[in-house]
Amino acid sequence: MHSYLSLPFLAAVLPTSASPLHQWSNRSAPASLPQISSVSYSGSGCPSSSPAVVRSGAFADPAFRLNAFEARVPDGTSTVNCQVHIQAEGASSGWQLGLESVTVHGHLVLDPGASLDWFVTSFFSQDADKTVTVRGSLPNSGGQRLSQDVASTTHIPAANIVWGPCTSGSGDVGLLNVNFRVALQTDGGQYGFFGKDADTAPAESWTYAWRRC
């Protein structure tokens, strides 16, 4: 039977700089929502020459299946990443968009004493100094090997959301970059794996918040 283990992953949000509080609601959105105008990929887990990424959903609810995303120790690469570069146009004028929540999942195998750290960092190219990172960790502190599909959703607090440029004219929301990285940690020869198995593959999806500007 195929199942997912839903985990908090000791999640934390790490902003690079404090942001002022603004009035906003995740139920607020422009009358005209943007449509994806371009998507590209980079990173060891989805190289631009052959990304092996399957995208589904519209800009409002994107999901990315990462078929070549794999970390393995001790006989492979302990860390792997995939960065999505996504741009959309057509939003109503006078709005800003920011990443609000991140969901990641995949198949995880950990020997006792091994752990998995994962990171999702987002920023807009128009203001690349402002970033926010969602970070989680899963250790295997038990006495047996862990082998399970895992999933985690983390919400970014309103004060830490990184906002894109204010829309006008073409309704360009900015070039959003979202980097997903995992790192396997061991203190010896333990086995660790994060990737796909027979019926699942690493994937990420996210949701947005909007505010007036």
Q: Language-model segments: what does each one mean?
A:
Residues 1-22:
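Fungal secretory targeting signals
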Residues 19-74:
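N-terminal leader/pro-regions and domain N-caps
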Residues 61-71, 103-105, 179-184:
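Generic short beta-strand segments
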Residues 76-128:
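Extracellular-facing segments of soluble proteins and assemblies that are Gly/Ser/Thr-biased and enriched
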Residues 84-96, 164-170, 209-211:
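Extracellular and analogous surface-interaction loops
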Residues 110-164:
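Short helix-loop boundary/capping segments
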Residues 164-189:
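Internal, hydrophobic beta-strand segments that form the core of beta-sheet-rich folds
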Residues 181-213:
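Proprotein-processing/basic-patch segments
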